Amino acid sequence: MTELLSREEYAAIAATLDLPQRAFIDGGFRDACGGRTFASTNPATGELLAQVAACDAEDVGHAVASARRAFEDGRWRSRTPAERKAALLRLAELLEEHLLELAVMESLDSGKPIRECQHTDLPETINTLRWHAELIDKIYDSTAPVGSAALAMVVREPIGVVGLVLPWNFPLLMLAWKIGPALAAGCSVVVKPAPETSLTALRVAELASQAGIPAGVFNVVPGGGREAGEPLGRHPDVAMVSFTGSTATGRLFLKYAAESNLKRVVLECGGKNPAVVMNDVEDLDLVAQHVVNGAFWNMGENCSASSRLIVHAEVREALLERIGAQLREWRMGDPLDPRNRLGALVSPAHFEKVRAYLDQARTERLAVRFGGATEAGIFVEPTVVDGVSPHSRLFREEIFGPLLSVTSFDDIDEAIALANDTVYGLAASAYTGSLRHALRLSREIRAGIVTVNCFGEGDASTPFGGYKESGFGGRDKSVWAHDQYTELKTIWIDAS
């Protein structure tokens, strides 16, 4: 792990950055066909970073055509597994060589604390690419038991051109979660980053070219959802879209697929994730540490954030006191200051959305136990709101900011009912000193990821995705991610 630098050293790196501004199509940078651009700004300061190419349907068409040519002529998919593996491992090496550059770029573009970009996002991005690269030559096809008169093979083939639509909260990491298995499988990709955070995806595309990934295999079209996302979702030569973002936008991609070529759609959408704390926990200080990290890491801009604390009434007050003590250690401020654990929210529009929920808490006359204030710019203190009922908007709606709602219960049946009282089902955490309670909570909570006595999402080897309106169609990460980027084919050879 690279050592953190001083704020001044990060600022010096920022001053030397050559920020990418144009779309990356067919192996090189190019302006948007219409010549339009949009402003990429630093959320912490409002400062203009770059005028980025604003792609539209024409640009998407060029990118898809480039990807389709690359797929059809086999310049990538026909390479041996060892050759694709070598290129992806080289890309991971290049990301490591440019780690500080990419970490600073990510922090400037997203408002994320540099300590998280450098010590979490970049290492996990690099590890994800290496993990999928190493998996390439360890996936076997199979034969079916049909007798000696025939040979029946069941094989997987790359699905084709894939549209990868990224969120703004983890631009680099979500890029790796998707390009890792997609490129490993032999697909060609067209990446549509969020307009709020387009810069690092463009830089990674450039590094991918240097790593030996052929022209046309890795394309990036920055732009808005209607202008670039919808044309990608509707394009007849796109075989699949993998989307991470809001449930509302996920529904649109299902519509685009239904109204075009019935392309495969994999959705990873929202979450309103519970942290259930039983009264038999052994270490409330440790529980408080995990709850605070789960709720406020990345400013709560995390689809798997533990935004609902569901706590047994007997330990509620003691736990809240410890949460308050933990929060005193969470500094908020300049994202390039490595002492800060909380940076700016991603945009003024998102800041106003989060602030509206703070106002809602006051309207409902709920107890704001900690935080609740905003600071100059678009900074929001980590906020804990107590006494939240299951009917409150704070309990039911995904806020995607540093706001933790607190609801108490009296027995495990009530806890499970509260945990499942949501349209989402992405993640959950359970804290208990009882193996019996741990097994029951982890089995009965309807979520794709359940952690016990910790907060997390597993590592690259474990699938990430959810139930209900949190998405469907596949999973990010792990060996299961590879399946969704392939088609299953049966080959029957009559040997009689």
Swiss-Prot record:
CDD domains, per the entry: ALDH_GABALDH-PuuC
Cystine pairings recorded for this chain: none
GO molecular function: nucleotide binding; oxidoreductase activity, acting on the aldehyde or oxo group of donors, NAD or NADP as acceptor
Keywords linked to the UniProt accession: NAD, Nucleotide-binding, Oxidoreductase
UniProt-annotated site: Important in defining aldehyde specificity, residues: 457
Phenotype when changing residue 457 to G/Q: High decrease in catalytic efficiency with ACTAL and APAL as substrates
Chemical reaction(s) catalysed: aminoacetaldehyde + NAD(+) + H2O = glycine + NADH + 2 H(+); 3-aminopropanal + NAD(+) + H2O = beta-alanine + NADH + 2 H(+)
Enzyme class: oxidoreductase
Active site: 268, 303
EC numbers, comma separated: 1.2.1.-
Residues reported in the UniProt entry to bind NADH: 166, 168, 192, 246, 249, 256, 269, 353, 398
Function: NAD(+)-dependent aminoaldehyde dehydrogenase highly efficient with protonated aminoacetaldehyde (ACTAL) and 3-aminopropanaldehyde (APAL). Likely participates in a still uncharacterized metabolic pathway present in proteobacteria species, in which ACTAL might be an intermediate, yielding glycine. Highly prefers NAD(+) over NADP(+).
Family: Belongs to the aldehyde dehydrogenase family.
Complex formation: Homotetramer, formed by two symmetrical dimers.
Protein name: Aminoacetaldehyde dehydrogenase
Organism whose genome encodes this protein: Pseudomonas aeruginosa (strain ATCC 15692 / DSM 22644 / CIP 104116 / JCM 14847 / LMG 12228 / 1C / PRS 101 / PAO1)
